[in-house]
Amino acid sequence: MKFANLTAKEFSDFTDRMTYSHFTQMEGNYELKVAEGTESHLVGIKNNDNEVIAACLLTAVPVMKIFKYFYSNRGPVIDYNNKELVHFFFNELSKYVKKYNCLYLRVDPYLPYQYLNHEGEITGNAGHDWIFDELESLGYKHEGFHKGFDPVLQIRYHSVLNLANKSANDVLKNMDGLRKRNTKKVKKNGVKVRFLSEEELPIFRSFMEDTSETKDFADREDSFYYNRFKHYKGRVLVPLAYINFDEYIEELNNERNVLNKDYNKALKDIEKRPENKKAHNKKENLEQQLDANQQKINEAKNLKQEHGNELPISAGFFIINPFEVVYYAGGTSNRYRHFAGSYAVQWKMINYAIEHGINRYNFYGISGDFSEDAEDAGVVKFKKGYDADVIEYVGDFIKPINKPMYNIYRTLKKLKK
């Protein structure tokens, strides 16, 4: 085995074969970092046949003017069941970054620690407890089992829907009542989904602005999304949910015709048997349904007059590799939330994953706080409703490469606080 620099193709070919690689460890992210002017390295291990058997993208930024801080975001990509390979890689990685005047190195492997449900109850251990002792023996310090959202540390909890051996109907059956109801609702309410082009990304950004204002969270800059769309190429999809009013109004009119037939039948039943309570109740219920239907028709006609035949209502930003669909971000028009466009977006992408044989549908980060007072309690409830599971990852590890200067660096940081 030998530690070596990799070409972009070698790196991409390998990471696309590994079933547990994160989108930050793919060629598109390397191209993005290079375009942004970030010092970037592609390194890995090759076996005696010159085949890549481990890889990672490393970035480096200046610290204390003359040193560098190296980071492998969700790396390395490696078979963590091969303990000998893991030991060799991390040992060689330290030697490599030392040659580039590294002050300290951070890694946060895309490696599950344990599995939980959305009540926070542990349902299983991933079998990777040994990694903590292994990395400690190599001089890496674990940063702890933190919860919540941190500007430096990667989120440690993901909400993931396992799609292995499941049909779309299976997924629908396993949803809770609200998710199931809204998914069926958008299917019959004229809500359509298409993918946005690069030029149309401002539509997505407008929804993100609406959502960030309503839910009071700080969103990324426009450039974050635009640059990833550009450099990740086909690995980013931005589905847009919109209403086609011609189709929606036609569906509502068809629904009204059925309701009118049922209503007339109820009237005839009452005429035949005035004491028939069941027929009277049915008549009242149908009157309510007809009233609601007419309100929807009126709303649809008014909105069509205001916006034209198509009205965008929700969009999402998804990042894809051969083994995972990641729901990175999404936003909805506050004014038209009642059309449940976000459910159409999720349903479209769940079906995309199933059709492309992708077994992991990642709703992405949650805080790890499963209490009702959690800052993301509503988000947790939404993701739980799809019958997703929670994966807790091992977390961050730091290795000081130049120990004396690293200690000075930490002291200076504390003084600045």
Swiss-Prot record:
The keyword Acyltransferase applies. Keywords: Acyltransferase, Cell shape, Cell wall biogenesis/degradation, Cytoplasm, Peptidoglycan synthesis, Transferase. It catalyses: beta-D-GlcNAc-(1->4)-Mur2Ac(oyl-L-Ala-D-isoglutaminyl-L-Lys-(N(6)-Gly)-D-Ala-D-Ala)-di-trans,octa-cis-undecaprenyl diphosphate + 2 glycyl-tRNA(Gly) = MurNAc-L-Ala-D-isoglutaminyl-L-Lys-(N(6)-tri-Gly)-D-Ala-D-Ala-diphospho-di-trans,octa-cis-undecaprenyl-GlcNAc + 2 tRNA(Gly) + 2 H(+). It is found in: Cytoplasm. It holds the Pfam family FemAB. GO terms for cellular component: cytoplasm. InterPro entries: Acyl_CoA_acyltransferase (IPR016181), FEMABX (IPR003447), PG_Glycine_Bridge_Synth (IPR050644), tRNA-bd_arm (IPR010978). Its EC number is 2.3.2.17. It is an enzyme of class 2 (transferase). One of its GO terms (biological process) is regulation of cell shape. One of its GO terms (molecular function) is nucleotide binding. Signal peptide: none annotated. Coiled coil: none annotated. Catalyzes the incorporation of amino acid(s) into the interchain peptide bridge of peptidoglycan, using aminoacyl-tRNA as amino acid donor. PANTHER family: AMINOACYLTRANSFERASE FEMA (PTHR36174:SF2), LIPID II:GLYCINE GLYCYLTRANSFERASE (PTHR36174). Belongs to the FemABX family. This is Aminoacyltransferase FemA. It comes from Staphylococcus epidermidis.
